[in-house]
Design a protein with these regions (language model features):
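Short acidic loop-to-beta-strand element that houses the catalytic metal-binding Asp/Glu
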Residues: 31-32, 205-208
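A long amphipathic alpha-helix within ATP-dependent nucleotide-binding catalytic cores
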Residues: 174-205
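Short, compositionally biased leader-like segments
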Residues: 1-7, 173-174, 179
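A short mid-domain helix/strand-loop element embedded in enzyme catalytic domains
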Residues: 146-177
Length: 208
């Protein structure tokens, strides 16, 4: 394991961006993506550190850590659902299939917690009792575990700090069929359960 001194000494070498001649980058918060003509995509995880979509600095080795973590989770969940990863030729790089993303963000929540406007606790504390189209009783406490995990959807708001909560009816109105939503719901819960099982082995608690 690297010492704090070794990490500090690597700050000047932190990986901010890359340029591949002949290809146009799609720059995200942390990853730079390049679409290839053959239907594949190059994803490069940088060391950019962001908070609510604002870059605040660079953290040495962050890119390779999150890229390798993603690769590990893809392997651990391949029996639940296919994924886009083809190869990891470098600690910071994933070669993947291009795919059309869902027009929504999906989050499985096991606890009533959070500090953002779209979090369960923020809305509950403000007096809301129907959140994401689901009814919640009075008397819940912050960070309390829910009787069972719930699947929630939110509108993707690119360039904005927070997402907007959606009900199932909102999801269907955005062109997602009831059949597809049922599959999304099922796969999301199974992924969350697998995540919980593996997190416990590392003395971690998967909250959402």
């Amino acid at each position: 394991m690297l010492t704090s001194a070794e990490i500090r000494s690597a700050i000047p070498l932190a990986f901010d961006e890359v340029s591949l001649p002949g290809l146009t980058a799609e720059r995200g918060q942390v990853r730079d993506n390049y679409a290839l003509a053959d239907g594949r995509r190059i994803g490069i995880a940088t060391d950019r550190f962001t908070i609510f979509e604002q870059q605040v600095g660079l953290v040495p080795y962050q890119g390779q850590i999150i890229n390798q973590l993603s690769a590990w989770w893809f392997e651990q969940t391949a029996d639940i659902t296919p994924n886009h990863a083809i190869d990891i030729p470098d600690p910071n790089v994933t070669i993947a299939l291009s795919a059309d993303p869902l027009p929504i963000a999906v989050i499985v929540r096991g606890f009533i917690c959070g500090i953002t406007p779209s979090s369960l606790w923020t809305q509950y504390e403000a007096g809301e009792r129907v959140i994401y189209g689901r009814s919640f009783p009075d008397g819940l406490r912050k960070n309390q575990e829910l009787p069972r995990p719930i699947v929630t959807a939110a509108e993707k708001t690119f360039g904005q700090a927070h997402e907007r909560p959606l009900t199932v009816e909102d999801v269907l109105a955005r062109g997602i069929s009831a059949e597809l939503w049922d599959r999304i719901h099922d796969v999301a819960l199974r992924l969350f359960q697998r995540g919980r099982q593996l997190s416990v082995l590392a003395d971690l608690l998967l909250v959402d």
